[in-house]
Regions:
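The feature marks non-catalytic terminal segments
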Residues: 59, 67-166
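Active-site beta-strand->loop->alpha-helix modules in alpha/beta enzyme cores, enriched
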Residues: 1-58, 69, 123, 145, ...
Length: 166
């Protein structure tokens, strides 16, 4: 893990921040950059989002993370995290200063919801969004698969051949 040592709660969309992110991306040369969504609830997260987009430029595609409770977020990629949900919850609980129990419950609700969007009523999924920007139009080979889709069939009521009187 790399820490840039910017103050918590005071991060801004500054040129200095974007420059430091760019330096790290040039050094690490990632295949994919996963960052907070531009509409995330937390100001620091929005600053990371803006900085990541500038820093990634033509170096790596950016995959936006579903913000808490998915407000105004239209995902186009889903990843089955069912085998890792317990680990995710343990990681969230490590953030003791943030009142983590609330965030664990929110993670469960959101994970079930995103899994259900894939037709899986059991399990957990995380949702992401990639906005294709040249030269990174297709990133499917860079991410794990979504939960398997379960087809749903809805039967319409049978229509009566003879018209009903009015």
């Amino acid at each position: 893990m790399i820490q840039l040592n910017f103050p918590d709660g005071e991060l801004s969309q500054s040129e200095e921040f974007a420059s430091r992110l760019t330096t790290e991306i040039l050094h690490l040369q990632p295949n994919l950059l996963v960052a907070h969504a531009p509409n995330d609830y937390h100001a620091d997260h929005r600053a990371v989002s803006a900085g990541a987009l500038i820093a990634a430029s033509f170096r790596a595609p950016v995959l936006w993370v579903d913000p808490m409770m998915g407000n105004d977020f239209l995902p186009n990629y889903y990843v089955d995290i069912t085998p890792f949900q317990d680990q995710k919850e343990q990681a969230i609980l490590c953030h003791t200063s943030q009142g983590p129990e609330h965030f664990v419950e929110m993670s469960r609700v959101q994970g079930h919801f995103r899994s259900a969007q894939c037709g899986q009523l059991e399990g957990f999924a995380e949702a992401f969004r990639h906005d294709p920007i040249h030269p990174f139009a297709d990133i499917r080979s860079l991410i794990p698969p979504a939960p398997p889709l379960q087809p749903m069939v809805v039967k319409s009521p049978t229509r009566n051949a003879s018209p009903k009187p009015i």
